[in-house]
Amino acid sequence: MAASVHCTLMSVVCNNKNHSARPKLPNSSLLPGFDVVVQAAATRFKKETTTTRATLTFDPPTTNSERAKQRKHTIDPSSPDFQPIPSFEECFPKSTKEHKEVVHEESGHVLKVPFRRVHLSGGEPAFDNYDTSGPQNVNAHIGLAKLRKEWIDRREKLGTPRYTQMYYAKQGIITEEMLYCATREKLDPEFVRSEVARGRAIIPSNKKHLELEPMIVGRKFLVKVNANIGNSAVASSIEEEVYKVQWATMWGADTIMDLSTGRHIHETREWILRNSAVPVGTVPIYQALEKVDGIAENLNWEVFRETLIEQAEQGVDYFTIHAGVLLRYIPLTAKRLTGIVSRGGSIHAKWCLAYHKENFAYEHWDDILDICNQYDVALSIGDGLRPGSIYDANDTAQFAELLTQGELTRRAWEKDVQVMNEGPGHVPMHKIPENMQKQLEWCNEAPFYTLGPLTTDIAPGYDHITSAIGAANIGALGTALLCYVTPKEHLGLPNRDDVKAGVIAYKIAAHAADLAKQHPHAQAWDDALSKARFEFRWMDQFALSLDPMTAMSFHDETLPADGAKVAHFCSMCGPKFCSMKITEDIRKYAEENGYGSAEEAIRQGMDAMSEEFNIAKKTISGEQHGEVGGEIYLPESYVKAAQK
């Protein structure tokens, strides 16, 4: 589709008038029609799922830790055959899942906020870490407990005109979600409220997603990671996608995007939402396109509106909508090396070219906002014209859309809708700062959400690395949410192993960014692991790592015996060449010889060498070279004498 858009560009008439003017949109009267649309959608999907045509096939497990079957198709979307993932205890040895209780003053609700406690040896205090793994040992057919039901019920009774976190924050109200996020981040709830009120942070939390454990996205908070999952027309199943959600969040994914484009889109999303404790985002244009049999020209506002309401009713926490792909911007991509690479962007662009009309998402932006502020669906304004290659980075088309994102952001804030802005893409490192600078300025410091960016195009199969480099860079500059890239990027649909690889790569990038921003928890985590490493507390080192399973398996490949877990060396250097063991020996020597500390031993050693240097003056140079100090260059005769 993107190719056909690219080929059609030269036929575009560029003298469009009045596109810069803000359209006059009628007041929305969406609410009376919501139930009708939802009922119609439910009826249609019920009919679609009555016929069974798929068969099951299996892939062999790719790791010892993943013995669950990887399904290619779903036989019965109403009752999938879910497979369990490895347990929390298997993934995180020496860790327990704990909860901190805090009381929401206004309601009296007791909130139980999760965290992961790593139990350390050697008298070291336990280390507490942010946890995204969600409730454990849950029957996926039943789904997670409805954590937020009482919170939502209480606020609904207040009869407020809007239901968004931004609305409450502007009123000076600290919601249960804000207190929950503040507790997770170890910050003052009032600070959370003020950042949400100013639009510098968002708490994606659809009032219909009752299973959600709230989290916050903003540049003054921990950098977060999003994991994309979803089926395609040729691969995956409901079982596999729910497994990916559970697996991604186990390893630290803070949000999930369901980008399904294949069969059972509605049912897949339903099962994901009922089993996800993290916010779930979508790109609604994908399902809208499926409703018109994949023909972009058959799309219209009514189909798109119906899809938005359907997904909001299910509990989707944020929508990616490419409303910044304007008709007049499409010709700007004509000379690109890779054209329009965004799926959503290309769909909107093709529709615009087919009718020579403005993007219907832009034209109906106020109507979209009216839907979002009734459910508290946050908007992730899509970057449909993002660069798809290093060659196209930071071009006119990309920044033209970003400027429009700023306009759409301010309009959303007027209706108390939470917003973040999506960013590139493929950008070399020296061009990354310009992206962050322009986004902060043009979008009034709304959270930035970037796909990487990939810093080079030469490494298919390793794009989780090429992009994590860019993600760490732009995260340190202020990007709040990093959309992961897996090793399969540009090659195929990622499986569960790819999902884990992508999440871990991006947790590294996010943590590196937190360190650069001098976040105190980030530094404490590094210090705890470094101390365990230096003291040869191998099990503590594994437990404190992002991926204990992999760290332990790599160590045990060459030193599998239990005794190796207490050895003061690894297979890299062996017992004689370990630098940390040598340093430990120096400290032990200093203590045994009464030097006190290693620092004192070093000081005394330097004093001794200084004295030896001064003695050299008396025995070699005498008055000929001055009365004080030794000589930098010793006479040849002295060297020969010393050698004898």
UniProtKB/Swiss-Prot annotation:
Q: What EC number is given for this enzyme?
A: 4.1.99.17
Triggers of expression? Circadian-regulation. Down-regulated by extrinsic thiamine, via a vitamin B1 derivative thiamine pyrophosphate (TPP)-sensing riboswitch regulation. Detected in both dark and light grown seedlings; increased progressively after transfer of etiolated seedlings to light. Up-regulated by salt, osmotic stress and abscisic acid.
Query: What are the protein's GO molecular function terms?
Result: 4 iron, 4 sulfur cluster binding; carbon-carbon lyase activity; iron-sulfur cluster binding; metal ion binding; protein domain specific binding
Q: Its domain of life?
A: Eukaryota
The UniProt transmembrane annotation reads none
GO-annotated biological processes: response to vitamin B1; thiamine biosynthetic process; thiamine diphosphate biosynthetic process
The kind of enzyme this is, by top-level EC class, is: lyase
Annotated residues for binding of Zn(2+)? H426, H490
Cofactor needs: [4Fe-4S] cluster
Q: Which InterPro entries match?
A: ThiC, ThiC/Bza_core_dom, ThiC/BzaA/B
PANTHER family hit by this protein: PHOSPHOMETHYLPYRIMIDINE SYNTHASE, CHLOROPLASTIC, THIAMINE BIOSYNTHESIS PROTEIN THIC
Quote the subunit structure annotation.
Homodimer.
Q: What does this protein do?
A: Catalyzes the synthesis of the hydroxymethylpyrimidine phosphate (HMP-P) moiety of thiamine from aminoimidazole ribotide (AIR) in a radical S-adenosyl-L-methionine (SAM)-dependent reaction.
Indicate what this protein is called per its UniProt record. Answer: Phosphomethylpyrimidine synthase, chloroplastic
Q: Which organism is it from?
A: Arabidopsis thaliana
